[in-house]
Amino acid sequence: MRNFTLSICVVFFSVTVKAQLTEKIETDRPDQTESPYTVPKKWFQSETGFAIENDKSGTKAFAHPTMLNKYGLSKRFELRLITEFISFQTPVIIPQGNDIVTGLQPIEIGGKLALLEEKKARPKISLIFHTAIPKTASKQFQQTNWVPNFRFTMQNSLSEFISLGYNLGMEWYGEEETKPSFIYTFAPGFNLSEKWYAYLEVFGFLNPDNHPQHSVDGGIAYNFSNNTKIDLSGGFGITKNTSLKNYVALGFSFRLPVEKY
């Protein structure tokens, strides 16, 4: 833990002092709404989060951590790699306590392509796509099939201090007989000051074989510099059949140039 903390401090210092862009870092966390902004060309960006999620069946999920790494391949396209190390704690009545399963979820690879810039009422639009690779997971989390997902991510600037982000997309599952779910998110964001940001959000999943699942969340973020950011968020399910009971998450993001620009 001491070495991990020291590494974070070194990264924080280096990206704060040595690498500066005039724009603040744009991240896909902490909300469920992905950002339409891509990483600058020849820059690397990492977004790391830790989360605790409770569902209504009594199962707890611990993400420790989930990590999204990005690289700006061009002005309009970024490569993306998602890894998630997770533990599930299920409520069972045994003398030793609850049953816990820990491991790596299937690694996701993909990209983000900037499609349109914001113009009057037209939002800034990008396309994000991933696929999960079955055999890259720990044995207990491996799936038979590749698992794709995509979403269009959009954002309108309502004023200097308020923006509106929203996503529409689909995600598939590892079982052939399961139909894909439609994804939606809707998140107004507020620039509270030069360094503070807050958001509120509604998001959900619609599947032909299941009841709609709708949830709300909110959070805050603080920019230490243009290239470093921390965030805190939480949310809960709002419909009867939503599996999510509540969650809380904490994250840290940074970016730095891979080559001189």
Per-segment meaning from a language model:
Residues 1-23:
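Bacterial Sec-dependent N-terminal signal peptides
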Residues 20-261:
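Transmembrane beta-barrel domains of Gram-negative outer membranes and organellar outer membranes
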